[in-house]
């Protein structure tokens, strides 16, 4: 019991420390990615055996491809401390249904036309869908929306989380805005 509390406090401290990290640049920032990765730690009912993180983009849109590449590079940043068990890969939106064993999906920039598909994928596969576009979560299409500029905001779509069967710890839910 004591170890669990220490783990939660450590995670909470790390998320709060992320607020002090400088911005990476581009549509999705390093800070957005750091916070998003730590959101995964607050999922209390994560399915076992899932270690993939799909960075979903639209290969037909240059800005989406560039943002996806920046997200992938930021996941390799030594300051991120990504768990060795989590493996990130770029996945074109047209190939998302073929991706398997995903723990989370990170949505690249310029994906608004695909929000319905992402929401349906999250519900069907019980996968956490993260976006740096807060409107994705506000619209109930992404599970979590994260923005770090001009100030940090984390929004959880209660509707999408429930439909996807995703539950978050109470400590996390106290730190975020739920829609």
What are these regions (language model features)?
Residues 2-5, 23-179:
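Short hydrophobic alpha-helices and adjacent helix-cap/hinge residues
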Residues 1-14:
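Bacterial N-terminal signal peptides that target proteins for export
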């Amino acid at each position: 019991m004591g170890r669990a509390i220490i783990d939660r406090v450590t995670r909470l401290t790390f998320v709060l420390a992320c607020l002090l990290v400088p911005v990476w640049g581009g549509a999705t920032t390093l800070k957005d990615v750091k916070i998003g990765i730590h959101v995964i730690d607050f999922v209390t009912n994560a399915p076992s055996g899932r270690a993939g993180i799909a960075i979903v983009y639209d290969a037909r849109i240059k800005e989406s491809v560039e943002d996806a590449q920046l997200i992938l590079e930021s996941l390799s940043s030594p300051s991120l401390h990504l768990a060795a068990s989590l493996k990130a890969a770029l996945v074109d939106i047209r190939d998302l249904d073929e991706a398997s064993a995903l723990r989370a999906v990170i949505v690249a920039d310029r994906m608004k036309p695909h929000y319905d598909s992402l929401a349906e994928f999250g519900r069907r596969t019980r996968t956490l869908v993260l976006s740096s576009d807060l409107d994705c979560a506000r619209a109930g299409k992404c599970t979590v929306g994260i923005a770090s500029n001009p100030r940090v905001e984390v929004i959880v779509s209660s509707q999408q989380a429930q439909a996807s069967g995703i539950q978050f710890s109470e400590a996390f839910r106290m730190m975020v805005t739920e829609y």
